[in-house]
């Protein structure tokens, strides 16, 4: 019966994952107590069968090996779940990293305040597994040197991003579009501020020496660049030059080109506010949003945190009376006792296809007291100091 229920449960999890999300399937099936109990009962039954059917005899060696295999598989699942840790280590070619981002997600809270005249900090870290398809309610009751506060769940949304929502009473923003590595990205430069985009400074109505300064005067827009550039008016394909340190009219919907960087200002400045909105399929930064209620000293503040698996975002800060709270949601950045350099990433495609890849391989260098090269690909795992790296 157990051998029938186990594959049925796994099949159910697969369907739930495709219908809803991976995290929903984990909450309902894979991480549920009943699924773990099912695996535990299976392991106990396999161990009991060894004695019951006298599988330790030479004649039944093949059956013994089969039973032991299942036992070790289930033990491995237990170790991975409760003792091991998983994560992702993103590295660009010719870069080095000594940390990875945890597969598990956490709510991290720093609380700053005074205790007997001395500034103190308390850290809270709570592992969360959330999905917008399940009931995520939780409440964290804590104190900061006998000052009680609580953090409670309000809402959770998947696949969102931060975007500009038009509002006549909002701040003015001008949109810039660039695609340095072939991926389209949109940036909004707030009026009166300076933004760093791909290590190039841009300002909007706030002159900054060494930046590409955009100004608006009586409904007209101007650009002044610290270096020479060219532009192409996309509607007419007419070319023009942008001279260094010369204030010129800004050509909207035109492609500006400087060495190693291309950008477009597609439209005039807009008034609006930045809010969490549903992400489009083409958006590069797709995150989750966790909404919380923070209650302290009889006052409640609502907090919206962007993050999720694979993200380590800056904390969102707020002050309630005499306590400062800094909250973030996402993965942990875990340090390794060694470094890995990615020398080359090789992706091979099936013949005659554009987006169907047949294999991947990473040529890396492990940097520690001893340094060595290694190729990571399918079925060729890098094992080093208790860590296993897969491609």
Give residue spans per PLM region:
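N-terminal membrane topogenic signal
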Residues: 1-2
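Short hydrophobic alpha-helical segments that form membrane-spanning helices or hydrophobic packing faces
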Residues: 5-6, 38-42, 76, 387, ...
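Alpha-helical transmembrane segments of multi-pass membrane proteins
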Residues: 6-20
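N-terminal ordered "arm"
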Residues: 17, 69, 150-151
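Perimembrane loop-to-helix junctions flanking transmembrane segments
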Residues: 21-30
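Residue-level marker of motif borders
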Residues: 27, 62-64, 381
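Internal alpha-helical transmembrane segments
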Residues: 31-108, 112
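Soluble non-transmembrane domains of integral membrane proteins
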Residues: 89-391
